[in-house]
Regions:
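Alpha/beta-hydrolase superfamily serine-hydrolase fold, recognizing
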Residues: 1-130
Length: 130
C-alpha cells in the first residue's frame, strides 16, 4: 500500500514559490490557468481543507500516511509544492521518495509528447508497487 503522486497539488493556492513564479507562463500549465482550475475545483470551499491541500495536515496526520512516492515535472508551477511536501514528510520520518524529471512539463502522464517522462512515470509507479 502506497501513494503515487504525479505533479501533485499539495496546497490549493498560488504559493508564490520559485517554480510558481519561474514557470508562470510558457510551460503548459501556467499560473493563471492553475488559478482558474483551483477556483473551479474548490467551488467556494476552504483551500486549506486537508482533502485538497494535504500540506496543511498536522504532523500526526501525515505520520499515518502510507509510503509516498512523488514524481514532479521540472518545469511546472507545482514542482516546489510537491518537493516541499516530500521534504516535510522526510523530516517527520515518513517513508517518502520524490524527484522532478529534468526538462519535463506538467501532464507528461496524460498528454502525448514527453515519451521519456511518461516511461519514467510508468517505471516510478511500478517501483512503488514492489
Amino acid at each position: 500500500r502506497s501513494l503515487v503522486l504525479y505533479y501533485p497539488v499539495t496546497e490549493a493556492r498560488a504559493d508564490g514559490s520559485v517554480s510558481w513564479r519561474t514557470f508562470a507562463t510558457g510551460c503548459g500549465m501556467d499560473a493563471a490557468f492553475m488559478d482558474v482550475c483551483l477556483v473551479a475545483y474548490l467551488n467556494g470551499h476552504d483551500p486549506r481543507d486537508l482533502l485538497v491541500s494535504p500540506a496543511f495536515a498536522t504532523d500526526e496526520q501525515l505520520r499515518r500516511l502510507p509510503p509516498v512516492h512523488i514524481l514532479g515535472a521540472d518545469r511546472d508551477v507545482l514542482r516546489d509544492q510537491g518537493l516541499r511536501f516530500a521534504r516535510r514528510l522526510d523530516a517527520l520520518g515518513c517513508p517518502v521518495r520524490a524527484e522532478a524529471l529534468p526538462g519535463s512539463t506538467h501532464l507528461f502522464v496524460t498528454v502525448k509528447g514527453q515519451p521519456a517522462a511518461f516511461a519514467r512515470a510508468v517505471d516510478f509507479a511500478t517501483e512503488a508497487m514492489k
